[in-house]
């Protein structure tokens, strides 16, 4: 992330931040960019149906300079098949975080503004 800006508040350094025009996207995989596949059925992950609008939109954001990180409830043992699927389908991205808590009903608590976007993949 070479676009990070170092900031100071009251003469003390704080965590670096991205410029205002660059966004940090955290994107779910199952049910968001492809079929919703549970961890209990990993054999389906390699052949998941891609949501074409997701590929077009996310790659556009990447090309605009935004950071794309997939944040999935898939477990670490499914990393290789997940990376292969993302790459074979042409997704451009910076990172992949595994092990997001399952079950939905998420509430995000942070010291930064968090915006949510409901992306209808189908």
Model-inferred region functions:
Residues 1-122:
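HAD-like aspartate-dependent phosphatase fold
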């Amino acid at each position: 992330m070479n676009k990070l800006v170092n900031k100071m508040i009251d003469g003390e350094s704080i965590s670096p931040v991205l410029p205002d025009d660059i966004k940090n996207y955290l994107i779910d995989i199952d049910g968001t960019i492809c079929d919703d596949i549970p961890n209990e059925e990993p054999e389906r992950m390699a052949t998941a149906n891609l949501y074409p609008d997701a590929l077009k939109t996310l790659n556009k954001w990447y090309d605009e300079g935004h950071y794309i990180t997939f944040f999935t409830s898939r477990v670490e043992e499914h990393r290789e098949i997940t990376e292969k699927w993302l790459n074979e389908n042409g997704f451009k991205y910076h990172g992949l975080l595994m092990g997001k808590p399952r079950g939905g009903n998420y509430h995000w608590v942070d010291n930064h503004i968090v915006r949510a976007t409901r992306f209808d993949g189908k």
